[in-house]
Amino acid sequence: MANVLKISRRRSGWNKGNKRGFAAHYSYKTFVAVVADVSATGKQVHIDKLHITVDCGVPVNPDVIRAQMEGGAGYGLGALLRNEITFAKGQVEQSNFDTYLPLRISDMPEIDVEIVMSNETPSGVGEPSVPPTGPAVANAIFAVTGERILELPMTQSGFQFV
């Protein structure tokens, strides 16, 4: 993990004084670090860029690894930004995509994926970027606004994704 953290810091340009968010995760024998750049006007938040560093052992197919990291980031962002199921009178209110708003490709920020070169046994890349993405963005929002997101999706805390 230490190597992933060092590379993540260098690749993202993170240094003292930057207002960014960070989170790291380990699963399926894979290390992932996410650095998030956001901008905000009040509680209107824009995700400018995600920097993802992954160490999954020998990178057998780098294009697939990048795609999995990007897709996992999208899934994690969806949970943070807008995935919400509500109920009324014991029934789910979201019955189709006109009432349930998943993250769309047009909502995705720029994503930079750095794959760590390694001689270790190849490991899983299907899900490890999901868990740290939301927390990295939430930490970036805190760094920029001084307010913590305490409920998901972030609209529950009064924030809006723009």
PLM region spans:
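Cofactor-binding beta-sheet edge motifs in enzyme active sites
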Residues: M1-V162
